[in-house]
Amino acid sequence: MKTTDVCPGTLASGFNTYSPLCLRKVFEGKKVSHIMDFSINDDTGGEIVASVNKISISGVQEKISAIIKKGKIIITPAGETGRYIIKPVPEYRNLRFRHNIPANEHLTMQIASQVYKINTAANALAFFADGNPFYITKRFDYKADGSKIKQEDFASIAGKTERNSGKDFKYSGSYEDIANLLKQNVSAWQVEM
């Protein structure tokens, strides 16, 4: 079992699980274990594939839909809407330091939030039953009542699709392209940049 002496969410010392502040920010005040009663292995592959196939979040890293049930993080059952996204250690074995990727993403988000006061998605680090870490983030595209908040990404604003821009259309833009789109579509674009 994975033990800790810091909050796996806020990284504050003196906690052996999530701190009250983390529980409020990430888990709506519910007491939640930082250890999942589940590990990714050959026996659980089907459950993972089913979850991955029903989530539509952009990006290249594997993402698994999750909910909180009885104080535990669990994979979203069929027919339910996930409120969290789990990002485990990538399966691609040639990635150097791949076991550090969940912690790196979490630390980066905490620096953005705590040091630079950037409004980020609520997030934490958690662990599978075998001790492997995963990054967990609360979905910001759903309201508390469960209704969906419509989101636009820059690929759709730019009119890019797989058909007109190729398979990797979401990743072919640049920051300059985004700045130009802001200038075209936002009256106070200087403030947004």
Give each language-model segment a name.
Residues C22, K31-H34, D153, G173-D177:
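Exposed alpha-helical structural elements
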Residues D43-G166:
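Conserved ATP-binding subdomain of kinase catalytic cores across diverse folds
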Residues V26-K31, D141, A158, E162, ...:
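Generic secondary-structure transition motif, activating predominantly at the C-termini of alpha-helices
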Residues M1-T44, Q184:
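Regulatory N- and C-terminal appendages and interdomain linkers associated
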Residues G159-L181:
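Active-site-proximal helix-loop elements at catalytic-domain edges
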Residues H99-Y116, G173-M193:
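Conserved kinase catalytic-core segment
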